[in-house]
Amino acid sequence: IISLITLCLGLSIQAQSNAELVSSTVVKSDIESHIYFLASDELKGRQTGSDELKIAAAYLANHLRKYGVKPAGENGSFYHNVPLETVSAPSNISLKLNDITGAQFLGVSVKNIDYDGEAVFLDFGSKEDFEKVDVKGKLVITKAGNPESTNMMSKLMAGRAKRELAKSFGVAGLIELIEVEQNMWERFAHYFNEGQTGLKNPEKTEKFVHIYMGDPAMTNAVSMANAKSITANLKVEGIETKEFSSRNVVGYLEGTDPKLKDEFIIYSAHYDHVGIGKPNAENDSIYNGARDNAIGTATVLSAAENLAKYPTKRSSLFILFTGEEKGLLGSKYYAENPVMPLNKMVYCFNSDNGGYNDTSKVTIFGLHRTTVA
């Protein structure tokens, strides 16, 4: 943290040594207090959408205001509201293919559906496989992944492209038969059974049905490949959608150079974490998120405090993102709905998962692409 703050301040007061900068501008106890508060049990792991994350957002906004940072959010506030929705996991998935009944399912993309009709088996489901038969409006069954997939993870990773391919052919849904690696299966089942949070879908477009069915020895895949025809009954039920909003926290300081102050350097971090989960060996179920990412958040607060005292030629934009642990949601929404023109951003210092052993290095990516230095 100290190294990053020193680097940031070095842009404006390069004449001072690093040691002088640290001793004159950084108060260790202040940084510690930010981290201890944000990572406290009282904030319950700062889950996106929780009341505790709202408390964290207010804490950040109040400190930016205290330092003299100007609000850059909505209606003169420090808040940049991010519209979100959580789609619950289904209460039930049942699937019957001819006389085969599935027992293990991962619903990676699902909607409530009751399908009775024809299914088609397409081996691994390559584009050539889809082009061989009429699949429109039918349920498509494939082996998971592609011929190059060697484990469950690689098979799941290949599924996204296959899902988009299936959608382009107008199929009713995609079922992939997958050999179960129990540890990996439990890991993904836990993730998908919690429901999925994403940016609010303003068009209310229906989700495409994409489900993995456990097939331990791939015997079902063999049966499907040998079947002359396949009748399918797929039922997915109990899915509910909850809409809510969460907050990015944004503020800015104006630069000192008349020619450069219209350009911005961003100092950012995400301030959310994963909330409450499975207890550890000490029966502690709160995932406090000190390293991920109370430390990074404290870095931005400290940079804001000091840059308010020692402003740079370019303007400074401070962004604390929500929803990172849910899939970079706050930063994605900000990129699509910026408070300042993106073409005026010349560099971004983002701090995430700091506090590891080596405190002597700060790595800068893309320095050759900017005029910030």
Q: What are the functions of these language-model segments?
A:
Residues 44-139, 146-148:
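Noncatalytic luminal/extracellular "stalk/propeptide" segments of secretory-pathway proteins
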Residues 1-19:
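Bacterial Sec-dependent N-terminal signal peptides
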Residues 18-19, 99-102, 106-132, 198-289, ...:
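Soluble metallo-hydrolase cores and metallopeptidase-like ectodomains found primarily
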Residues 101-203, 207, 254:
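Extracellular/luminal Protease-associated
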Residues 18-25, 42-51, 81, 106-109, ...:
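Second-shell loop/turn segments in exported
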Residues 36-39, 121, 139-143, 172-177, ...:
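Structural recognition of the beta-strand scaffold that forms the well-ordered cores
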Residues 210-211, 219, 312, 321-373:
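Metal-dependent peptidase/peptidase-like ectodomains
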Residues 15-74, 130, 187, 262-264:
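N-terminal hydrophobic or amphipathic helices/low-complexity stretches enriched
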